[in-house]
């Protein structure tokens, strides 16, 4: 199962951590892992393009984390898009992805 931890301070996202594999299907055919990977990597790329200094991030096989250092409206919007997309995947595949907000 993919585990997503979203740390928030009221409505502001401080970090997003994604770990694990969905095991929906075998590697190369797993649409849940592929979808989550595309959301997370694309989101990190958007954050970097907007303001690389606003975040710290780590991204490797089966794990990604974004920590927000400096928030502004554009960074916040990108983070909201990432989380909305992840919640959409969770709605469709609740046995394979779990989102926890702290």
Predicted features along the sequence, with ranges:
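N-terminal intrinsically disordered, cationic/polar leader segments
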Residues: 1-31, 41, 45-102
């Amino acid at each position: 199962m993919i585990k997503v931890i979203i740390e928030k301070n009221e409505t502001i996202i401080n970090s997003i951590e994604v770990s694990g594999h969905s095991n929906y299907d075998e590697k190369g055919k797993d649409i849940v892992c592929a979808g989550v990977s595309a959301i997370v990597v694309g989101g990190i790329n958007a954050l970097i393009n907007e303001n690389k200094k606003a975040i710290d991030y780590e991204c490797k096989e089966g794990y990604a984390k974004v920590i927000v250092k400096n928030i502004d409206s554009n960074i916040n919007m990108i983070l909201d898009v990432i989380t909305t997309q992840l919640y959409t995947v969770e709605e469709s595949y609740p046995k394979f992805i779990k989102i926890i907000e702290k």
